[in-house]
């Protein structure tokens, strides 16, 4: 008789006799801490675990599914939704689907799922492999944590330096603002001084006005140049549309546009500055032309002469600035007086104080934003700017923490936000007939910065996996789940699915 024929005839009898023996002791397929759930009542009946259905206790493990939840057949394959408990002494207790019970395939390492064939006990071997994998995993996490701790210390030190610099700038800003106020009052007082005279400061008023107007003209000319460049780029793209060179030209045009955007714009002068200079000129002209009891024809001629001398001095100064005259040609009688020299020195001090204040305000604002921004990692300042490169699929990918991501020379995105160990980079270069490129970088614990994989999940949207000590956490250290006692402990697992995934993750 063939084995298959013998198995078909004898299996029901053997299984039935086995289940009868187990009925008197622990039920097959039931964890020891669940055995109390499988006790008959005084009448020999038993209630299904997942419903109110009452059956005879003799129907438990009789190879026929009576309960809707399959709880009456923990040790057979009768119920499609049942589950069998593998004790796996020396390894990790687990559950398997009950349709794998007595299918002549050994699923439990202790072989308890197969009653008709002899399964080798592989629990000890699996335990050794598991412990080796667990030890290696924890070693990597610990090494990554050591590096991360160093980065965190560096970041904390840099944060303290930023805070100290912020306080220093704040104190300096207060002092410079007070100094500027004093100098401004001093200069205004000197302008109104009879020793200096309005005719002496009027050229300075005109000089300020001239500089402001020239700055506005320069700004207008620069903007016109930028407009002309952009217009030419668009004209070239229009002419090359639907040609073989369009993609290449498009790339060059975009790079040119990026370079153009990065060029520094000259200092802007607002219309308020021009208005203030005009008002100052008007005030000092009023001082010259206002009614006076002492005005005579002779004094009027002298005043006109002084004004003309001032205008000539202003013109000479302009010619010197343009490199037409030498500085020696700028001397005029107005600069000979001690009062004027003191005024000129005070004006220089005021200009220097104003420039210093603007510089301090700019740095103060930058530091304030830096301190107010909350980053996802406490080691932000230590790793900002760190580059990680790898060639994948013929492209060189570069990830710069908290800055940008590149595919060769193509910008995939600038850093936008962080959620946990996921960094988002957005507003990269535009795809042809598509959106702006973007990248999501998911970082896992590792002993060094490494790009693991790159996937273009959707058009121009890239998913990048990395390893880095930055993503290591003490929570990632795993404890052994081995069942070291000779008793099934279901508390060692949180269900069949959780257990299998926990082991696989190692």
UniProtKB/Swiss-Prot annotation:
Signal sequence extent: 1-23
GO (cellular component) term, any one: glucosidase II complex
Effect of residue 462 to F: Impairs N-glycan recognition
Example GO BP: N-glycan processing
Compartment annotation: Endoplasmic reticulum
Coiled coil: 172-243, 338-374
Disulfide bonds: 86-108, 431-460, 445-472
Domain of life according to the entry: Eukaryota
UniProt cross-references to SUPFAM superfamilies, sorted A to Z: Mannose 6-phosphate receptor domain
Annotated motif ER retrieval sequence, positions: 503-506
Pfam families, sorted: PRKCSH-like, PRKCSH_1
UniProt xrefs under InterPro entries: Gtb1-like (IPR039794), LDrepeatLR_classA_rpt (IPR002172), Man6P_isomerase_rcpt-bd_dom_sf (IPR009011), MRH_dom (IPR044865), PRKCSH (IPR036607), PRKCSH_N (IPR028146)
Domain MRH: 279-474
Transmembrane is among the record's keywords: no
Alphabetical keyword list: Coiled coil, Disulfide bond, Endoplasmic reticulum, Signal
Gene3D superfamilies for the chain: Mannose-6-phosphate receptor binding domain
GO molecular function ontology, one term from the record: mannan binding
CDD domains in alphabetical order: LDLa
Free-text function comment from the UniProt entry: Subunit of glucosidase 2, which cleaves sequentially the 2 innermost alpha-1,3-linked glucose residues from the Glc(2)Man(9)GlcNAc(2) oligosaccharide precursor of immature glycoproteins in the endoplasmic reticulum (ER). Specifically required for the cleavage of the final glucose. The subunit beta retains the catalytic subunit alpha in the ER.
Subunit relationships: Heterodimer of a catalytic subunit alpha (gls2) and a subunit beta (gtb1).
Comment field on protein domains: The N-terminal conserved region (G2B region) is required for the interaction with gls2 and its translocation to the endoplasmic reticulum, whereas the C-terminal conserved region (MRH region) is involved in the recognition of N-glycans bearing from 5 to 9 mannose units.
Name of the protein described by the UniProt record: Glucosidase 2 subunit beta
């Amino acid at each position: 008789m063939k084995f298959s024929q013998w198995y078909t005839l004898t299996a029901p009898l053997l299984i039935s006799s086995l289940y009868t023996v187990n009925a008197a002791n622990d039920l097959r397929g039931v964890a020891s801490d669940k055995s109390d759930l499988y006790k008959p009542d005084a009448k020999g009946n038993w209630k299904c675990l997942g419903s109110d259905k009452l059956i005879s206790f003799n129907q438990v493990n009789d190879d026929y599914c009576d309960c809707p939840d399959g709880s009456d057949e923990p040790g057979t394959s009768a119920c499609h939704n049942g589950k069998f408990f593998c004790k796996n002494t020396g390894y990790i207790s687990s559950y398997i689907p009950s349709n794998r019970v007595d299918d002549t395939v050994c699923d439990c390492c202790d072989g308890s799922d197969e009653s008709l064939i002899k399964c080798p006990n592989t629990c000890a071997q699996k335990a050794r492999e598991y412990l080796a994998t667990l030890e290696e995993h924890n070693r990597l996490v610990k090494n990554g944590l050591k590096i991360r701790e160093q980065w965190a210390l560096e970041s904390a030190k840099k944060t303290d330096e930023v805070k100290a610099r912020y306080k220093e700038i704040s104190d300096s800003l207060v002092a410079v603002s007070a100094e500027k106020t004093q100098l401004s009052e001093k200069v205004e007082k000197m302008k109104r001084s009879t020793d200096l005279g309005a005719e002496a400061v009027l050229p300075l008023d005109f000089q300020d006005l001239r500089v402001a107007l020239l700055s506005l003209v320069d700004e207008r000319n620069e903007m016109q140049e930028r407009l002309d460049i952009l217009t030419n780029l668009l004209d070239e793209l229009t002419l090359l549309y639907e040609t073989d060179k369009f993609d290449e030209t498009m790339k060059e045009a975009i790079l040119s546009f990026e370079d153009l955007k990065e060029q520094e714009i000259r200092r802007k002068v607002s219309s308020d500055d021009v208005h203030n200079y005009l008002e100052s000129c008007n005030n000092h002209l009023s001082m010259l032309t206002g009614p006076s009891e002492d005005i005579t024809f002779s004094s009027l001629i002298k005043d006109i002469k002084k004004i003309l001398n001032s205008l000539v001095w202003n013109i000479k100064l302009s010619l010197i600035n343009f490199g037409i005259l030498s500085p020696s040609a700028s001397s005029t009688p107005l600069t000979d007086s001690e009062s004027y020299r003191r005024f000129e020195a005070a004006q220089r001090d005021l200009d220097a104080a104003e420039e210093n204040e603007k510089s301090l305000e700019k740095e103060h604002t930058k530091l304030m934003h830096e301190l107010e921004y909350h980053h996802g990692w406490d080691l932000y300042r230590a790793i900002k700017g760190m580059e990680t490169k790898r060639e994948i699929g013929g492209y060189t990918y570069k990830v710069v923490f908290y800055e940008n991501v590149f595919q060769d020379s193509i910008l995939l995105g600038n850093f936008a936000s962080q959620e946990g160990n996921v960094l988002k980079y957005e507003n990269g270069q535009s795809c042809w007939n598509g959106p702006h490129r973007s990248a999501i970088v998911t970082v896992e614990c590792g002993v060094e910065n490494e790009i693991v994989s790159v996937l273009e999940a959707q058009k121009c949207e890239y998913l990048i996996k990395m390893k880095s000590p930055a993503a290591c956490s003490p929570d990632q250290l795993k404890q052994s789940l081995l069942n070291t006692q000779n008793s099934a402990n279901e508390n060692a697992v949180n269900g069949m699915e959780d257990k299998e995934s926990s082991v696989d993750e190692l």
